[in-house]
């Protein structure tokens, strides 16, 4: 590693990443996920291997992790169906009986359809005795419109209640307005042309929204405009006021409303960095927050975990892989490391 002028020069990897802008590019194989469809997939062999792993002498946890963390979610669903046909037993229930602790939680999450997993996490967040508004924002603000629609449909089917009804009964004020707007969708799509006049109107509207009676102005701006437009609004707001929009949120809002708006602003500005921050926070706790680690690594491993890894390394000076190695112990370490995939030097 070279040193220039008394300062440590950036590593070759860091320099390349800074020029690539990995968070906004698609890799050569068409995804920024760490987990991709397994090319030599044999559903029969995988189902047989899992059966041997739980019926042999002792549970072969390594085999279970190896199969489930190297197959796409679609392939895992095919394995589950094959296992059911082969044994007349439910794979999730069989593995649940064989495993325990955080490894059990990881395996259960890996085997659930995406929408079912999200619906359960959203329900838990809305019904939590302590505030879990950040989880609700994460799910409602980072899923694609089709993913969110499917999640809400599963929510209604599984819990016999609309998610919007739970939001209405469990929240209030601007937080309720914000979550309802996100759940109902309606964010416009980017046409490729930035409307500078509308951006200026939004900036002025946010500046005028000083008192409690005007707080609702923030909701349509944050939930109906596309991210490209909002980034322009954030920039113009700072130029007009000399204050970052996040500072205005901290000054004007409190409690869950503040948490929700700050989280949403972070998602809008840089979604991979938003997730990197959440992972770092989960790893800094006295006991790692496994619920957060499991949810993010599993939900993003097939979409943009490479981007999240790059943002994590850039901001915190240490790779996500090494951070997981240092903080996570026990059987679940190998599973989370497999989802993370590799070291970033």
Curated annotation (Swiss-Prot):
GO terms for cellular component: cell surface; cytoplasm; cytosol; nucleus; plasma membrane; synapse; vesicle membrane. Keywords: Annexin, Receptor, Repeat. Annexin repeats lie at residues 41-112, 113-184, 197-266, 270-341. Transmembrane segments: none annotated. It comes from the Eukaryota. Low affinity receptor for acetylcholine known to be targeted by disease-causing pemphigus vulgaris antibodies in keratinocytes. This is Annexin A9. Pfam families: Annexin. Signal peptide: none annotated. One of its GO terms (molecular function) is phosphatidylserine binding. Expressed in the stratified squamous skin epithelium, but not in epithelia of other types (at protein level). InterPro entries: Annexin, Annexin_repeat, Annexin_repeat_CS, Annexin_sf, ANX9. Belongs to the annexin family. GO terms for biological process: cell-cell adhesion. Homodimer.
């Amino acid at each position: 590693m070279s040193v220039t002028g008394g300062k440590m020069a950036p590593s070759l990897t860091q320099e390349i990443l800074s020029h690539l802008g990995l968070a906004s590019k698609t890799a050569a194989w068409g995804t920024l996920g760490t987990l991709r469809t397994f090319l030599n997939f044999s559903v029969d062999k995988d189902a047989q291997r899992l059966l041997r792993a739980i019926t042999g002498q002792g549970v072969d946890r390594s085999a279970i992790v190896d199969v489930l963390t190297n197959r796409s979610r679609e392939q895992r669903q095919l394995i589950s169906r094959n296992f059911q046909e082969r044994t007349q037993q439910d794979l999730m229930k069989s593995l649940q009986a064989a495993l325990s602790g955080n490894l059990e939680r990881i395996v259960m999450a890996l085997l659930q359809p995406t929408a079912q997993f999200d619906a359960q996490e959203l329900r838990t967040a809305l019904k939590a005795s302590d505030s879990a508004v950040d989880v609700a924002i994460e799910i409602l603000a980072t899923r694609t419109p089709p993913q969110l629609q499917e999640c809400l449909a599963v929510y209604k089917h599984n819990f016999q209640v609309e998610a919007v009804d739970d939001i209405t009964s469990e929240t209030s004020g601007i937080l309720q307005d914000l979550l309802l707007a996100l759940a109902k969708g309606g964010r416009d799509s980017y046409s490729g042309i930035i409307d500078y006049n509308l951006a200026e109107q939004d900036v002025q509207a946010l500046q005028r929204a000083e008192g409690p009676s005007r707080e609702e102005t923030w909701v349509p701006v944050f939930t109906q405009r596309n991210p490209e437009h909002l980034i322009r609004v954030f920039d113009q707001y700072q130029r007009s006021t000399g204050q970052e929009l996040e500072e205005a949120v901290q000054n004007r809002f409190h409690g869950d409303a503040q948490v929700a708006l700050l989280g949403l602003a972070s998602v809008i500005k840089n979604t991979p960095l938003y997730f990197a921050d959440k992972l770092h926070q989960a790893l800094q706790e006295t006991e790692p927050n496994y619920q957060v680690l499991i949810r993010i690594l599993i939900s993003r491993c097939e979409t943009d975990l490479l981007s999240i890894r790059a943002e994590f390394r850039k901001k915190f000076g240490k790779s996500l892989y090494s951070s997981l190695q240092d903080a996570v112990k026990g059987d679940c370490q190998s599973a989370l490391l497999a989802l993370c995939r590799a070291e970033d030097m």
